[in-house]
UniProtKB/Swiss-Prot annotation:
Residues 554-613 form the KH domain. This is Polyribonucleotide nucleotidyltransferase. The keyword Glycosyltransferase does not apply. It is found in: Cytoplasm. Keywords: Cytoplasm, Magnesium, Metal-binding, Nucleotidyltransferase, RNA-binding, Transferase. Its cofactor is Mg(2+). HAMAP family: PNPase. The gene is pnp. It catalyses: RNA(n+1) + phosphate = RNA(n) + a ribonucleoside 5'-diphosphate. InterPro entries: ExoRNase_PH_dom1, ExoRNase_PH_dom2, ExoRNase_PH_dom2_sf, KH_dom, KH_dom_type_1, KH_dom_type_1_sf, NA-bd_OB-fold, PNPase.
């Protein structure tokens, strides 16, 4: 196939799509250029599904090569290793709008690999990767109901910005990524500076409108490439099996969905499934039916039973009304030795969230393609298998945990103090101890409380809520504070976090087309009412940050010295700074601009370290009297240390008003003596006198 190129203007960037020259053995491959940021995105689809495959094995891997930024990886191994957090998050960002566009019965393995091969540090690879994945899948001839477009939206001075650069985002009140087809929004991921619901919805519709040019270009590309449509045909439904199953189940599932407790409901449904499969076992054998298909169709019955029930009765499977939030319980300060903690329970979803305060050196150093930087606010989300009553793998965080942690972090970022306002590294850990839907939003609520319990000066409390949707034709219901089953069996997962003032984070995943702007508007308004209710419940535990830090949290003292004096504080080979930290038990960080941060759980020790540094950096003043220690005896006099790192000479003629024949007769090393500074010459040499003090001259150094 000859090389095909398509170029278009997208915001401030020139975007080029190329296919037919590179990676020609992949099912679909495209090079995406967004100015100087260049990605190769490939899609490969297996010709057939594996035997017994009962799920759609789609994998997406986004990777940033260090050579893209002209760098060699740091550390011992000089090659890229496992996926970074950013790579994992962008991989999920690509997966989410693509997965629902494949047919439900399609089980062939599909793999998308997006490789960043050149990176302009001001143009991120996320939007280019989404566009490339859409184009590669469209070229692959899979039964992909795309293409999709993607756009990043900023907001500044009341105006939306299409595909802002990283520099522009620093001053933007919004960073929102939206992806979807020509007719529908499928995915939204965003963080915002407490914006209104109207501004957030406007950003979604703005991005969806602008991305149409991407969809049109991809359609043109596939036509020119001569891509043949997929020949895959969905397997025919076994109507006899479905009829037999419905007859065997009867109204049992409807009854099971009236059980309000999650675990009891799960057990009731499992018992019905077991009985039905056993009752139909003979017919399955005689008719040659597939037991896997029978199990799948049972799941379809579950899906329709729950949906039909809530659409008809407007009552949910746990008995709540559509807009009712589950009962909430909150406690702050639940763990005695931590710096800040909270227990947040909402129905059958529960999180223990802990805040830890550290110094600047505790920040995480990130070795990224665009350059090394330090992260001083860390948010980690853990989802152990016991939280859903199961056994499972326990260890390194999975992609889902990284994604949920990032969403929860976005939820509280807008209210966090700057490093200048609160010079601590802050780590928040959310341990999900129970889960029945919306655990990431429970993490937002719990983290807000734990941060305030730790005394972090957040601007306002933050709460989060997950919304759902069930839609059949023109009938639809919007659900507040969804359960796990409502998420799994519903059409939308719509998470909103924010304060009473506005939205700080919005994440949306939609499984169907036909979600109108009016439906999204209703969901946002219903979410706001739920968020305000949750904030009211949270206020029963804490309304503002505690005034005092925990007794176990480090106290920070900050002093400023002239940058030229940094070497004096450090000392030869680090001897001075090491002596101070060892003797006072403190941790000391020195920045290039002369800012010194002293950290210690003991306030007295921190003050002692501060005094030592002030002594070292203070200038020796002629005419002042200091108390010093004799450091060395010489024939012509004695050297006396008057300040740390500062020695002066007492000449033999200045030791006493009487004649001194031998210095050792009057002074010994280690003696404490009071001396007056006679002179500090241009070379910094200090002349001292003991005689002048005895004669009553000079002003004590302590007299300020």
């Amino acid at each position: 196939m000859a090389k095909i190129t398509k170029t278009f203007q997208y915001g401030k960037h020139t975007v080029t799509l190329e296919t037919g020259e590179v990676a020609r053995q992949a099912s679909g491959a495209v090079i995406v250029k967004m100015d100087d940021t260049v990605l190769l995105v490939t899609a490969v689809a297996a010709k057939t599904a594996r035997e017994g495959q009962d799920f759609f094995p789609l994998t997406v891997d986004y990777q940033e090569k260090f050579y893209a930024g002209g760098r060699i990886p740091g550390g011992f191994f000089k090659r890229e290793g496992r996926a970074t957090e950013k790579e994992t998050l962008i991989s999920r960002l690509i997966d989410r709008p693509i997965r629902p566009l494949f047919p439900e019965d399609y089980k062939n393995e599909v793999q998308i690999i997006a490789t960043v091969m050149s990176m302009n540090p001001d143009i991120d690879g996320d939007i280019a990767a989404l566009i490339g994945a859409s184009a590669a899948l469209s070229l692959a001839g899979t039964p992909f109901n795309g293409p999709i477009g993607a756009a990043k939206v900023g907001y500044k001075n009341g105006e939306y910005i299409l595909n802002p650069t990283i520099t522009e985002l620093k001053d933007s009140q919004l960073e929102l990524v939206v992806a979807g087809t020509a007719n529908a929004v499928l995915m939204v991921e965003s963080e915002a500076a407490l914006l209104s619901e109207e501004v957030m919805l406007g950003a979604v519709t703005f991005g969806h409108r602008e991305m149409q040019k991407v969809i049109n270009i991809i359609n043109e590309l596939t036509v020119e490439a001569g891509t043949k449509p997929s020949t895959w045909v969905a397997p025919a439904k076994n109507t006899a099996l479905i009829s037999a199953l419905k007859e065997a189940v009867g109204t049992q599932l409807a009854g099971a969905f009236q059980v309000r407790d999650k675990l009891q409901r799960r057990d009731a449904i499992s018992a019905i499934k077991k009985d039905v499969l056993e009752s139909l076992a003979g017919r399955v054998a005689s008719e040659g039916w597939s037991s896997a298909e029978l199990s799948k169709e049972f799941g379809e019955l579950e899906y329709h039973t729950m949906r039909d029930s809530v659409l008809e009765t407007k009552v949910r499977i746990d008995g709540r009304a559509l807009d009712t939030v589950r009962p909430i319980s909150v406690q702050a300060g639940v763990l005695p030795r931590t710096h800040g903690s909270a227990l947040f329970t909402r129905g059958e979803t529960q999180a223990i969230v802990v805040t830890t305060l550290g110094t600047a050196r505790d920040g995480q150093v990130i070795d990224a393609v665009a350059g090394e930087y330090k992260e001083n606010f860390l948010f980690h989300y853990n989802f152990p298998p016991y939280s859903v009553g199961e056994c499972g793998r326990f260890g390194a965080p999975k992609r889902r945990e990284i994604g949920h942690g990032r969403l929860a972090k976005r939820g509280v970022l807008a209210v966090m103090p700057s490093l200048e306002e609160f010079p601590y590294t802050i780590r928040v850990v959310s341990e999900i101890t129970e889960s029945n839907g919306s655990s990431s939003m429970a993490s937002v609520c719990g983290s807000s409380l734990a941060l305030m319990d730790a005394g972090v000066p957040v601007k306002a409390p933050v709460a989060g809520i997950a919304m759902g949707l069930v839609k059949e034709d023109d009938r639809f219901v919007v659900l507040s504070d969804i359960l796990g089953d409502e998420d799994h069996l519903g059409d939308m997962d719509f998470k909103v976090a924010g304060t009473a003032e506005g939205v700080s984070a919005l994440q949306m995943d939609i499984k169907i087309e036909g979600i109108t702007e009016e439906i999204m508007k209703q969901a946002l308004q219903q979410a706001k009412a739920g968020r305000l209710h949750i904030l009211g419940e949270m206020s029963k535990a804490l309304t503002t940050p505690r005034q005092e830090l925990s007794d176990y949290a480090p106290r920070l003292l900050t002093i400023k010295i002239h940058p030229d004096k940094i070497r004096e504080v450090i000392g030869k080979g680090g001897s001075t700074i090491q002596a101070i930290t060892k003797e006072t038990g403190t941790q000391i960080d020195i920045q290039d601009d002369g800012t010194i941060i002293i950290a210690s759980v003991n306030a007295i020790a921190a003050q002692a370290a501060k005094s030592r540094i002030e002594q070292i950096t203070s200038d020796v003043e002629p005419g002042r009297i200091y108390e010093g220690k004799v450091a060395k005896i010489m024939d012509f006099g004695a050297f006396v240390t008057i300040l740390p790192g500062k020695d002066g000479l007492v000449h033999v003629s200045q030791i006493s008003s009487e004649r001194v024949e031998k210095v050792g007769d009057k002074l010994k090393e280690g003696d404490l003596v009071r001396v007056k500074v006679l002179e500090v010459d241009k070379q910094g040499r200090i002349r001292l006198s003991i005689k002048a003090v005895e004669e009553g001259e000079g002003v004590p150094a302590s007299a300020e």
